[in-house]
Amino acid sequence: MTMVPATRADADAVAALHLASWRATYRGIFSDAFLDGPEALANRRALWDGRLASDFPARRHVLLARDDDGALVGFACVLPDQEPDAGVLLDNLHVHPARKGQGLGRQLLQAARAWAGAQEPASPLVLYVFERNVSAVRFYDRMGGTVVARRVSGNPVAGGAVELRYAWPPAHRPAVP
């Protein structure tokens, strides 16, 4: 497996993997009608077309995990300026559903933490996860994250689901176990 920065040419593949991850993980949080309808893919394509455009703010990092054949198997997106009062935001960490449990999430999180620490050494790394996404909650607990806040999601398709904000303090950014 290799880790490489994303380019504009990766937008469609990242959008497709993002949606595959949502479909495997967010049933019961997002409606099936949304997840299975054309709006979800259009939503993800618009997001990644924008994030990977050349005029997107330079302070962002989208890291791709590719298998030995070059297929996209995971990605992480760090947005340092998205929530400056909370810390450096890890906005996305997704692994292809068929590749979960192989250490890819751990490697992506470790790489995201290293990049965040280099950009903003005095800021914590933070992320939001749906409380009902039990496998992700367990993963972040194992990775040493601490729940520091709860909120009702502002995502209109989340139906008022609760999100947990996890944080890793800046002084405590050792390699992920």
Residue ranges, per PLM feature:
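Extreme N-terminal starter segment of soluble prokaryotic enzymes
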Residues: M1-M3
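Acetyl-CoA-dependent GNAT
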Residues: P5-R8, A16-K100, R106-Q119, R150-S153, ...
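Conserved beta-strand-loop-alpha-helix junction that forms the acyl-donor binding cleft
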Residues: K100, V126-V137, S153-A161
